[in-house]
Structure formats: C-alpha cells, structure tokens
From Swiss-Prot:
Binding site for Cu cation: 240, 290-291
Organism: Ornithorhynchus anatinus
Topology versus the membrane: Multi-pass membrane protein
UniProt superkingdom: Eukaryota
Mitochondrial intermembrane side: 41-50, 118-140, 213-227, 287-298, 358-370, 434-446
Pathway(s) it belongs to: Energy metabolism; oxidative phosphorylation
Mitochondrial matrix topological segments: 1-11, 87-94, 171-182, 262-269, 328-335, 401-406, 479-513
Protein name: Cytochrome c oxidase subunit 1
Disulfide bonds: none
EC number: 7.1.1.9
Length: 513
C-alpha cells in the first residue's frame, strides 16, 4: 500500500506533498552550501581551499536552490495542491505524467551531487559559460554530469508545464471563465507557458555544449568558426524568463495572503493583476541581453535592452500598488503569513529598485560581476521567492496537514529570517559599489567589515531555518486541530475541511455563470 500510494501516486495532493518534502530537503542542502560560501568569505584568507572548490560550491548552491528548492515547492508543491482545489477539478489533467515529473527530480539531484565528486567538480557558475565549461578548462565528466542533471530537471519542468496548462484551461467547470480563476491559478498558468517556451532553448544550448565537449563540434569554439557569445544568448534567453518563473507563483501566493488577511473578498484590480503578470511574462523574453552588457554590444542594442528592461518595472509596480490598495481599508490581521507578505512587498521592491539601477547599461558595465548584482538577485530571490514560499507555507499549512502552527514560534521564525537575510545581503550592495568581484574565494582586506557582517547574517538565517524545523515538529507533536476557517466562499480550497479528503470534486461542479 505504501509503495502504491507514494511511489506510483496519481493523486495531486500526494504528489504535491512529495514535491514539498523534496523541496524542503533540497532547501536544507542549498542552505548548507550557502553557509560554506559565507564561512569562506567571513574573513580574508582561505578556509576550504582554492577557487575551484569554492566555485563548485557556488554552482551547486545556485542549481540546488533554483531547480530543486524554489521550483519544486512553488510549482510542484503549491501548484499541485492548490490548482485543482481552486478550480474545482478532481485532479490534474495527466495524473501519471504528474508522478513522472516528480520522480525525474531525485535522479536529477543525484546527478548534480555526483558531478561535484568526480574530477574537480563543475566550478563554472550556474551559467556554465564556455570556454571555462569546455573540455580543456573542465576536463573530465563533472560538467557533463551537471548538463545531464539539467536535462532531467528540464524535462520534468516541461512535462509539469504541459500538465498545468492543460489542467487550468480544460478542467474548470464549464461555466467558469478564465477570468474567474484565482490569481494563484493565473500565476501558475503564466509560469507554465514561460517554462514551455524557455526550457527547450536551454536544452539546445547545453546539448551543443555537451557535443562541443565530447564530439568535437565547435558551436562555441572560435577555432572552428563557433562563438562563445552564442552560448550566452541561448542561455540567457532561458535564464531571464527563468527568474520570472521563480517569482511569478510567488506573486500569486502573495495576492492570496494579502487579500485573505486584509479581510477582503477579492484583491484590488484583479484584471490589472492578471494583465500585469501576462505583461511581465511577455517582457521577460525580450530583455535577455541585459545580462551581457559587458560582451561588447552596439550602443543601439544596449539602448534597446536598457529601455525594455526598465519597462518591466511598470507592470511590477501595478502589482505592488495593487497589493497596497488591497491592504487599504481592510481589517488587517497581523498573522505570520501577513508578516511574510508585507516583508515580501517591501524587500521585493528594494530588489526591484537595484534591478532598475543595473538595467542602465552604462552603470552595469561598472557593476557587472560585482556583489551589487549578488545583492540585487538575492533581494528578489532570498527575500522575494523565499518569503512568498514561507508565507504560503504558514498560510496553507493547516490545509495541508490539518494542524495549526504555533503563532509565536512562527513570528520568532519570521523575525530571525528577516534580520538574517537583510544582514546578509544589504552590506553586499556596499561591497559591489566598492568593486568587490563575484565568484572569488578571497578578497583584499579592505572588504573585511562588510563580508564579516554578511557572514554573520547568514548564521542568523541558519538559526531561523532550525527554528522552522522545530516549529513544524511542534505543530505535528501538539496536534492542534483547525477549528474554523473564515472567508471560505472566496477561498474555495478550504471548503472541504482541513485536510481535504483524498478525492475532492468527484462529481462535476456547477457554478452560476
């Protein structure tokens, strides 16, 4: 029975739970890697060895956090659990494919871990640029294993994307229009479209890199008429939509939390929110070369990518101000999920502002590959995506488990995490402006103070992670059952109780048009 339920599952709730557990586990691994990075940088001099092992850790940290933590939790975990419940579907459109999407991830994770144990590991950075990723600078199988890992994770995501698109378009009640679905459902739909369009380009790029390394092709080798810049274009045509894939489901989660704990029936500007997400999704595909301002592009090309990138701030601003308008006049409950959501809105906005700075090609030429960039994307990921995940988790934990978290521990957890991530990443803006480059394991001692503070912050965040583990244990040990849930008519995922029965919506749902 155990094997049938958990290995061969076709139930969206069980598969969602598997994704959440896998993502939590990978998140621990990714956190451990980040602690190694910050320990190395806590003071000048060397702790772990040379730059190769350091860059292997940095590369693994990025891949683990992106492909095995944020995406499985947001899309696989929350997506699987909530999308069918929110649209009144009995399950996903392709339940067995859903199971395969999940089970491609553990082998993918294994390949990534193995890649760092053979030869000297893949110390390429998550971008895997040739010629550093070529077979001279990285002889041996490590980069090849990392590429295979990416292939598996990519196939998993593409299949999941097909499944979500089909489910959301086809499995609504006949009378329900697409514009009556909740914003989280919209965010997953748009994310799935982005995945479907961007991942094949990554697959093409890394497959060409694989043949360059092993079959003597020269796609990215000037000696044979290739061009390493082509790889950068292919990678970032995937890589930029990818960062929006990481944050869009978070937008959906935050919309639900802000609406719910403001006591509102609906978010402010529903249609504006939907169009904003669609605009962000579209614009995300036409700004990729802002990651490449330093490779020597024409001034008119740089002008285009600068202005196109800045345009994304407009739909993003629509979302931020709509969240604030949703709060306005509401009966605000200062619950832990609401704290995460408010933290998200503020810190994501700060990260967005540094993004506007980096969008200027003239400034980016100075700031490219410095800690300013690291600070920017960790503000939108470590305090955007992660805060959304935490907010969604503490908000929907009673739905998933049937038990309530201890609110005091949840607030302690939030406070520690808030202090930790800000202490870690705010000083990195100063390091970047002072010219400290990324991806080095050592630095001149002029940079010591801010690095020491940054590393101190990472240990505060580590403490927060441990508090979270305790908080989850405490909830399951105390078994406080959910008494009642408010606002169920406008939050239909709660209608079936906590937790909902194994099968929901077995008979078709009829809604008034």
């Amino acid at each position: 029975m155990f094997i049938n339920r958990w290995l061969f599952s076709t139930n969206h709730k069980d598969i969602g739970t598997l994704y959440l557990l896998f993502g939590a586990w990978a998140g621990m691994a990714g956190t451990a890697l980040s602690i190694l990075i910050r320990s190395e940088l806590g003071q000048p001099g060397s702790l772990l060895g040379d730059d190769q092992i350091y860059n292997v850790i940095v590369t693994a940290h990025a891949f683990v956090m992106i492909f095995f933590m944020v995406m499985p939790i947001m899309i696989g975990g929350f997506g699987n659990w909530l999308v069918p419940l929110m649209i009144g579907a009995p399950d996903m459109a392709f339940p067995r494919m859903n199971n395969m999407s999940f089970w491609l991830l553990p082998p993918s994770f294994l390949l990534l871990l193995v890649s760092s144990t053979v030869e000297a590991g893949a110390g390429t950075g998550w971008t895997v640029y040739p010629p550093l990723a070529g077979n001279l600078a990285h002889a041996g199988a490590s980069v090849d294993l990392a590429i295979f890992s990416l292939h598996l994770a990519g196939v998993s995501s593409i299949l999941g994307a097909i499944n979500f698109i089909t489910t959301i378009i086809n499995m609504k009640p006949p009378a329900m229009s697409q514009y009556q679905t909740p914003l989280f459902v919209w965010s997953v739909l748009i994310t799935a479209v982005l995945l479907l369009l961007s991942l094949p380009v990554l697959a093409a790029g890394i497959t060409m890199l694989l043949t360059d390394r092993n079959l003597n092709t020269t796609f990215f080798d000037p000696a044979g008429g290739g061009d390493p810049i082509l790889y950068q274009h292919l990678f970032w045509f995937f890589g930029h939509p990818e960062v929006y894939i990481l944050i869009l489901p978070g937008f959906g989660i935050i919309s639900h939390i802000v609406t719910y704990y403001s006591g509102k029936k609906e978010p402010f500007g529903y249609m504006g929110m939907v169009w904003a997400m669609m605009s962000i999704g579209f614009l995300g595909f036409i700004v990729w070369a802002h990651h490449m301002f330093t490779v020597g592009m024409d001034v008119d090309t740089r002008a285009y990518f600068t202005s196109a990138t800045m345009i994304i701030a407009i739909p993003t601003g629509v979302k931020v101000f709509s969240w604030l308008a949703t709060l306005h006049g509401g009966d605000i409950k200062w619950t832990p999920p609401m704290l995460w959501a408010l933290g998200f809105i503020f810190l994501f906005t700060v990260g967005g502002l540094t993004g506007i700075v980096l969008a200027n090609s003239s400034l980016d030429i100075i700031l490219h590959d410095t800690y300013y960039v690291v600070a920017h994307f960790h503000y939108v990921l470590s305090m955007g995506a992660v805060f959304a995940i935490m907010g969604g988790f503490v908000h929907w934990f009673p739905l998933l488990s049937g038990f309530t978290l201890h609110p005091t521990w949840a607030k302690v957890h939030f406070t520690l995490m808030f202090v930790g991530v800000n202490l870690t990443f705010f000083p990195q803006h100063f390091l970047g402006l002072a010219g400290m480059p990324r991806r080095y394991s050592d630095y001149p001692d002029a940079y010591t103070l801010w690095n020491a503070l940054s590393s101190l912050g990472s240990f505060v965040s580590l403490t927060a992670v441990m508090v979270m583990i305790f908080m989850i244990w405490e909830a399951f040990a105390s078994k406080r059952e959910v008494l009642s849930v408010e606002l169920t008519t406008t939050n239909i995922e709660w209608l079936h109780g906590c937790p909902p029965p194994y099968h929901t919506f077995e008979q078709p749902v009829y809604i008034k048009a």
